[in-house]
From Swiss-Prot:
<feature type="transmembrane region" description="Helical">
    <location>
        <begin position="192"/>
        <end position="212"/>
    </location>
</feature>
<feature type="transmembrane region" description="Helical">
    <location>
        <begin position="107"/>
        <end position="127"/>
    </location>
</feature>
<protein>
    <recommendedName>
        <fullName>Uncharacterized membrane protein YjbE</fullName>
    </recommendedName>
</protein>
<feature type="transmembrane region" description="Helical">
    <location>
        <begin position="42"/>
        <end position="62"/>
    </location>
</feature>
<keyword id="KW-0812">Transmembrane</keyword>
<feature type="transmembrane region" description="Helical">
    <location>
        <begin position="67"/>
        <end position="87"/>
    </location>
</feature>
<feature type="transmembrane region" description="Helical">
    <location>
        <begin position="9"/>
        <end position="29"/>
    </location>
</feature>
<dbReference type="InterPro" id="IPR022301">
    <property type="entry name" value="Integral_membrane_YjbE"/>
</dbReference>
<keyword id="KW-1133">Transmembrane helix</keyword>
<keyword id="KW-1003">Cell membrane</keyword>
<feature type="transmembrane region" description="Helical">
    <location>
        <begin position="134"/>
        <end position="154"/>
    </location>
</feature>
<dbReference type="InterPro" id="IPR005496">
    <property type="entry name" value="Integral_membrane_TerC"/>
</dbReference>
<dbReference type="GO" id="GO:0005886">
    <property type="term" value="C:plasma membrane"/>
</dbReference>
<feature type="transmembrane region" description="Helical">
    <location>
        <begin position="159"/>
        <end position="179"/>
    </location>
</feature>
<comment type="similarity">
    <text>Belongs to the TerC family.</text>
</comment>
<keyword id="KW-0472">Membrane</keyword>
<dbReference type="Pfam" id="PF03741">
    <property type="entry name" value="TerC"/>
</dbReference>
Amino acid sequence: MEHDYLISLLVIVGIDLILGGDNAVVIAMASRHLPDKQRQQAIILGTFIAVAMRIGLTSAAVYLLNIPFLQCAGGIFLLYLGYQLLIEKKDTKHIKSSTSLWRAIRTIVLADLFMSLDNVIAVAGASHGEFSLVVIGLCVSVPVIIWGSKLIHIALEKIPLLIYAGSGLLAYTGGEMIVRDKKLSLFMAQHGTVETLLPILTVAFVILASIYYQQVEK
């Protein structure tokens, strides 16, 4: 029994760590323009709100999958988020600090909400009804998310072009969510090329659209 518990725990921790890497990218990108103190607040608050929300999502995992086009809507949101983070201006003096902070937290939480959909289903299955496994797995992933986002922020400061890689990751994840939506499964099964190419095309679309916007704004 203990052996099965440990195996399930390792599986859940692995799932949470994989998602934690994606979360760290989103957190670093969403908070990169904030002053140091507010960035720390955004990282900590955003992480803990997202983790608490994911615990609730895991409890409702089965019901979530029955909502029509939820994954598709989440995928489209991630495309928008990837685009928005690319065109975001660093000069935010006209925005109140508190507004910027809560906007960053909102971005982190919403991105986590949609990016977690697939993972909470996997976690719910791996936990076999042991809710303690869900909580332990998420607690283990928290330091990874927090420290990972700080390291990614440092990398973004040194190599600004990495923002395109981060947005590309969001776009690709969004494209994958769209093609995996249950309501679109029949169409995707009949058009295998679309299923393969769509995530790649969404990356190209988001990056090219942001470059076009920046050229127009000059």
